[in-house]
Amino acid sequence: MIEVEVENRSGVAVDEPAAVELVRQVLGAEGVDSGEVGLVFVGPDESRALKREHLGIDEATDALAFPIDGTDALPDGLPRQLGDVVVCPQVVGDEWRPPLVHAVLHLVGYDHGADMEAREALHR
């Protein structure tokens, strides 16, 4: 099972159950049936700081992915940590699904390009 730990630091209401379900659907479609994902909702200031720190771009963004590149075998019963997704509700507004899908696909190894776009199209 995919465990999704949600933290909302954005200061606005978020449909957390729908977001968790979407994360699970995308990962399931990618053949991931177990693991843990952090899903964090942040405000524009934190989004901007994270993008500046990690990508060198000084602007708020819709979503960021922080994959954990764990390919080593794990002991039985220990869940794989897939990474964290950070979403800024104030930037994405009602159109939060596409950026969330995009970020989750980064967690499973997709980079920008045709393969990513094809996978994103499956979740529209």
Which residue ranges define each predicted feature?
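An acidic/histidine-cluster motif and surrounding catalytic segment
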Residues: 1-99, 104-124
